[in-house]
Amino acid sequence: MKNGKVFLRLSVIALLLACTSGTIVQAEDVSGKVNEVSESAEDTVYGGNAVDGSALNNQLSITKEASVNGSAYSGYSSNREASGNTLKITRTGTIYESAEGGYVNSGSGAVSGNKVFMESGEVVQSINSGSTGGSGDATGNS
């Protein structure tokens, strides 16, 4: 009978592990993030970075003569929507790639209502208040 109890316990443990071992990934929006970059960054910087969701109402500020050796995105979505994001560039050094208010990398997500404010500094590639690498519309950005 002792072996039966051990087998039952092991069966219950195996069942629990099987039910919880898989990772369920759901689309998750990134909203309301505020990020200030005041020291130079070696890579791309983000206000909100949504891997599989929308980037909504995020803010990125680059201040105190900080340089960025990549791009600066206030709202970045890999495949959904990027709306209402704000990029502020004040007293900065150089952004060596692009400065983007809102950006959707692929898919049909809308890019709207994003803003870029630039007081001083240099952007080597491009400045876009809102753009997309996908098929969605980019409208109402400034």
Go through each PLM region and give its residues:
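Gram-negative bacterial Sec-dependent N-terminal signal peptides
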Residues: 1-27
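Surface-exposed loop/turn motifs in large extracellular/passenger domains
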Residues: 27-44, 49-71, 77-98, 104-126, ...
